[in-house]
Amino acid sequence: MNDSQDKIVAIVPAAGIGSRMGAEIPKQYLLIDEKTILQLTLELLLTHPKIDCVVVALHPEDQFFKGLPLSSHHKLHTVVGGSERADSVLACLNHLGGDCWAMVHDAARPCLTHGDIDKLIASRQRFPQGAILAAPVRDTMKRGNADGTVKETVCRERLWHALTPQLFPAALLKGNLEQALAQGANITDEASAMEWAGVSPGLVDGRVDNIKITHPDDLLLAGLFLGNAHSLER
């Protein structure tokens, strides 16, 4: 890889309102130990030595981001996001210049570790098409009926929980996202856009504590994970 192809830009779609949290402010601005979720996530990305810069997609009426201590960080850029995650990611990709790798990470996953980022970056040698962090399914899986009863047990062999970051060549991801959205495809993450285009992303085994904060109980759990991580660092 040449220098420009080796450049890594982190993309953080943070334009959502997080309605499932039942909070008055977007979930990325809720606090864990006196820091917002978004602050914790951005700190993790900005301090990784192999990430050149971070682009954050914000809601057009966001009133909270400028209050973050790192909002003016020299490696941090912002764009106006869209109504859906894919629209926000595409806005960030349009902001990028040149040939690089796009590492897309959920704003509500503050428990990511530098070690997992290292593993994902290293996977480019094995998966030049791109890869995602993922965790093998360990629990018994059930498919349900519409009435809330069990329909059947699903074989968990070769099933993975998709996590983030997800790392792809930026130009390839941008092109596939644009085409998929134009065709009305249901794009739930970056890997699904690549799959839609016939690309099979690599799977990189990630830590199960890299949770996405979606419900109120997740705040406490994330705080425990982050506290344990800090204890281990000391």
Curated annotation (Swiss-Prot):
Pfam families listed in its UniProt record: IspD
Site entry (Positions MEP for the nucleophilic attack), positions: 156, 212
InterPro entries in the record: IspD (IPR001228), IspD/TarI (IPR034683), IspD/TarI_cytidylyltransf_bact (IPR050088), Nucleotide-diphossugar_trans (IPR029044)
Pathway noted in the entry: Isoprenoid biosynthesis; isopentenyl diphosphate biosynthesis via DXP pathway; isopentenyl diphosphate from 1-deoxy-D-xylulose 5-phosphate: step 2/6
Known catalytic reactions: 2-C-methyl-D-erythritol 4-phosphate + CTP + H(+) = 4-CDP-2-C-methyl-D-erythritol + diphosphate
CDD domains in the cross-refs: CDP-ME_synthetase
Domain of life per record: Bacteria
Keywords recorded for this protein, A-Z: Isoprene biosynthesis, Nucleotidyltransferase, Transferase
Signal peptide: none
Entry's EC annotation: 2.7.7.60
Any single GO BP term: isopentenyl diphosphate biosynthetic process, methylerythritol 4-phosphate pathway
Site location (Transition state stabilizer): 20, 27
Broad EC category: transferase
GO molecular function, one term: 2-C-methyl-D-erythritol 4-phosphate cytidylyltransferase activity
PANTHER family membership: 2-C-METHYL-D-ERYTHRITOL 4-PHOSPHATE CYTIDYLYLTRANSFERASE, CHLOROPLASTIC
Record-stated family: Belongs to the IspD/TarI cytidylyltransferase family. IspD subfamily.
Biological function: Catalyzes the formation of 4-diphosphocytidyl-2-C-methyl-D-erythritol from CTP and 2-C-methyl-D-erythritol 4-phosphate (MEP).
Protein name per UniProt: 2-C-methyl-D-erythritol 4-phosphate cytidylyltransferase
Species assigned in the record: Shewanella sediminis (strain HAW-EB3)
Primary gene name: ispD
